[in-house]
Structure formats: C-alpha cells, structure tokens
Regions:
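Small-residue (G/A/S/T)-rich helix-start motifs and N-terminal tracts that mark the onset
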Residues: 1-81, 197-199, 208-369, 377-395, ...
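Nucleotide and nucleotide-moiety/phosphate-recognizing core
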Residues: 36-127, 131-177, 359-362, 386, ...
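Internal gly/pro-rich beta-alpha loop/helix module
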Residues: 120, 125-241
Length: 525
C-alpha cells in the first residue's frame, strides 16, 4: 500500500474522476465506509451520532455518512460550521434529521445539548486540503467540543466487581473523517486545538501526515478504506506502507522436502560479560521465524552461561578480554564464518570490542551481514566505515545510533525519518532499518517502506535484539536484503501488537515477543 502526499492524492482523485469514477461516486463510497466502521463499533439503531460538518468535501463525506446512519436507525444530529445547501442536505432534511448551523446558534445551546448525550462525534470539518492554523468560528467550535468531551469522560463511572476495576468505556467515541481537523497531512504537524480521534477513516491511501508525529498520535486507530480509485494511478509513488499481502508475497517458502540446511545458517556474533541475554534473544528469534541452524559466537568467558540459556543453538566460544571479544577472536571467527548464510554482528558486544570490530572489517570478504547495536556504534568511529562493510548489509540503528553513524543530531533525524533513511541508504550502499514508531526501511536504489506499527510495548530492553535475529533469519532463508529487512520488521511488529493486546502496552518484555513470532508468521503466511 502506498503512502501519499496531499498533492499526489489530489492527482489520483482527478484522474479517477476523468476516467469515470466520479467525485460524487468517491464521496458516496467514502461516507459509506465511515458509516460501516461506526456500525462495526456499535449498534446504529438507537445510537446518537453528532456530525460536525465543514464546508468542503470532507463535510460532504460526513453528510453521506449521516444519511446512511440515519437510514440504519441512528438518531443523527448535524452541526454545520457554515450553512450549506446541496443534495446531501436535502436528503437529510427529507429524513427529518436535526440540523443546526453555528451562525444560527450563537450560544451553542443546540451543540451543547447534543454533546451532552451523544454516543459518537464525527469530525468532518476539514480534510486533507487544509493546512492553515485553526481560527475564528472553527477554533471556537473545537474548543467547545473538546471541553464537553473532557468533562463527560471525567464523569465516567468506574464499576467495580469482586474488587477488580472494570475499564470505563470512552464515551463519546470520536471518529475523524480522513483525520482530526488541524492535522497537516503532509508533515504531521498538529494544531493545538485539534480534537484527538479514537479512530480515523482515510480513503484510498494513508497520507504522510498519518505516519509522522505529533499528528499520528492524534489519529487513533487508522483505517484505510477504498473509494474505487485505480491502483495503477499510484504506481509512480515510491513510499509504501507494509501490509500482509505484500509481506506474504515476500516470505520464504517452506518446501515439504526441506532439511535444516534449506532454511539457512545464521552466525550471531554477540554478547559480553555484561550482556548475556542479547545473543539468546537474537538466536531464539531467528529460530522462531524459521532459520535452520543458529550458532552463537560469543566470548569464551560467558560460554557456560550461554549454553545454559538456550538448547537449540550451537556455539563458537571466542577469545575475549575482560568479557568482551578481543582482536584475537577475528581469525577464529573467520575460519568458520564463510560457511554461514548470514552473520548478525552487534547485540550486546559493548564498545570494549572496538579492536575486534576494526580488525574484522579488514581483509577478506564476509557473508551477508546484519549489523546492530554496538557493531554500529563502533563502526561509526571508523572513517568512511561504509566502504569496509560488504554491500548490501542490513543496518538496524535506532535514532541515537543513526545520529552517530551520520553525524547528524537526533532532532534532525526525527524531523524527516524517511528522507534521512533514503539519503544514507543510497550514500552508504546498504539497507537501513531506522527503528522507532513507523520504522523505515530504505534501500540503496531508493525504495522505501514504512512499518504500520507505533507500539510503546516494543520500547523495552532486548526488543532490538529480537528484531535483529528475525531479520537475520529472513536473510538466511534466501531473501534479498531489502525484502529480508521488511519481512523481519513486519513480523517483529506483528508480534509486538499481539503482545500488547494480550498483556498491555506496559509490562511486555522482549521474551514475550519470542513466543508470538511463530504466531505472527502463521497469521500472515
């Protein structure tokens, strides 16, 4: 699924209209999609739904939704920012729907009456084409709505049964058409008066602003609904959002006559006296998504600890100095590493392994690489390090590590994560996995894809080790670097979503992801 700018979406809609899928038809489908989503959350009959309607097409989408919910038995109220008179308004008047306009309601008494007991508020005030600061009547309207919503939610009662608190329902449910009014759909900026949504329904494609903060945090659950546009109209758009269909097409096959060699051998060069968990997390993750054989190349001083933590791995104890891999480990590692499909280097190494990393990336070639954590931090200290790394490696930095690799500030990286990832993937000749909410995968040829996950449950120690092991396993099973990175990140994100739904956003530990990785793989493939 592609991610589009406002201008790209405008061109797609214009081309669709010119080819026979008219604006009116697209509006009917858009409004119907919002109605369908609302009805999937609550019974329409008997529900009270308040629509906040602006003067443009976003308001038109809202009016179509209002008509359809009225026909489904909902009690509908329409509150207009400005008076409007079109076929949608005529249809609602014929149905006896309550309609009020802000200029005719100077005390907002009609608005307040509906806000006091509605079940759903639909924000259809401004859509993707608006980027100006909120002001005037629109600002006043949103302030009134926000105040009433806050007051209602503060009064909600927590029921208690058997001394176990029951979660209070969020009432009213706030649904945004395209996204909350005040969102800039090109850069994710958010007006301070924007009304955060519980869910947003956007059309045809997600917009760039849906994936960039702070705006992304105000969209709630994002649902993308088709409106009849031709997918071919987006073929020239580079930025994509990963989805199950795409990932399924890339996942490695599992032939019935396979043996463990079929699914690749992963060498994991990792660990230190201070970090004995990282190698185990990475190795277990690799096995959990299908790697045939995993070998842990770790400091010999922690070999006993390693062998007690994991039964399935094989081991290559290497020389170390004070618990970190030493320069002397390089020759022993090189004697074995050529027979492996991929090498993951970095989890838990610590920066005390500097001489080891410096020597390893000299001389003869290495197998395909996934570089994580302290491998990245140590490479960043080497001038023109990317020329010493066999291309295309997969690099998995978080923003702090990316800052060290690039020399940029974290703030500069976070300001435009996609552009930064693409720029340096091209420059370095390696695949970049820039971790974080909506992780970015960028390839040297300019391809890029965003993960659809913004999950605080993944912000936990060891989560990156699980990700690195998952990506390494995908690479070992024969995927190209870009596809391996995308599949690994998607499986990791899906496992994180499963853990969050079962456990909550707090309390998930990296080990919780391991048991869910096979379930994530099963759910996609």
């Amino acid at each position: 699924m592609k991610i589009v700018t406002v201008e790209q979406m405008r061109r797609i809609e214009a081309a669709s209209d010119a080819s026979g899928s008219t604006y009116a038809q697209m509006m009917e489908l858009a409004g119907g999609a919002v109605a369908h989503v609302i009805q999937s959350r609550l019974e329409a009959r008997g529900s009270r739904v308040l629509f906040l309607i602006g003067p443009g097409n976003n308001g038109g989408d809202g009016l179509v939704c209002a008509r359809q919910l009225s026909d489904a038995g909902a009690e509908v109220g329409v509150y207009l920012l400005k008076p409007r008179d079109d076929e949608h308004m005529i249809a609602l008047r014929e149905r006896g729907v309550f309609i009020a306009a802000m200029p005719d309601d100077p005390s907002q008494s009609s608005l307040l009456a509906w806000l006091g007991n509605c079940d759903v508020i639909v924000d259809a005030l401004l859509g993707t084409g608006a980027s100006r600061p909120l002001s005037g009547d629109l600002a006043k309207l949103l302030s009134v709505v926000a105040g009433e919503v806050t007051a209602r939610r503060a009064k909600s009662i927590d029921l208690v049964a058997l001394a176990w608190p029951m979660p209070a329902s969020r009432s009213p449910l706030i649904v945004a058409v395209d996204g909350p009014t005040g969102l800039n759909y090109d850069n994710g900026e958010l007006d301070s008066l924007a009304l955060p949504a519980d869910l947003s329904v956007t059309f045809a494609y997600p917009k760039v602003g849906h994936t960039r903060f702070p705006g992304a945090g105000a969209c709630g659950e994002l649902i993308v609904a088709g409106i009849g546009t031709d997918p071919a109209l987006a073929n020239d758009i580079d930025l994509a959002l990963a989805d199950p269909t795409l990932i399924r097409a890339w996942l490695p096959a599992r032939p019935i006559d396979a043996h463990k060699g079929t699914f690749g051998k992963v060498m994991i060069v990792a660990g230190s006296i201070d970090y004995t968990g990282a190698p185990v997390l990475a190795a277990t993750a690799a096995y959990r998504v299908g790697a045939g054989l995993v070998t842990l190349a770790t400091p010999q001083s922690i070999h006993a600890i390693m062998s007690s933590k994991i039964n399935e791995a094989t081991f290559l104890p290497l020389p170390d100095q004070e618990g970190a891999l030493s320069e002397e480990a390089v020759d022993e590692l090189r004697a074995r590493i050529d027979s492996y499909s991929v090498a993951l280097i970095g989890p838990g190494l610590t920066t005390h392994a500097r001489a080891f990393i410096d020597q390893l990336f000299r001389g003869k070639p290495l197998p395909p690489l996934v570089l994580d954590a302290d491998a990245l931090n140590l490479l960043a200290k080497i001038e023109r390090w990317w020329l010493r790394v066999p291309a295309p490696a997969i690099l998995t930095p978080h923003p702090g590590e990316m800052a060290r690799l690039t020399g940029l500030s974290r703030e500069a990286i976070e300001a435009d994560r996609v552009a930064i990832a693409i720029k340096f993937a091209k420059w370095w000749g390696h695949v970049v996995v820039l971790k974080g909410a909506f992780s970015v995968i960028a390839a040297p040829d300019g391809q890029s894809i965003l993960m659809p996950f913004a999950n605080p449950a993944l912000a936990t120690a060891g989560s990156g080790d699980v990700l690195a092991g998952t990506i390494a396993a995908m690479r070992a099973q024969g995927l190209a670097a870009y596809e391996a990175a995308a599949c690994g990140a998607y499986l990791h994100g899906t496992a994180g979503e499963m853990a969050r739904r079962e456990i909550g956003s707090a309390g998930v530990v990296a080990g919780d992801l391991l048991t869910r990785l096979p379930l994530a793989l099963k759910s996609i493939g």
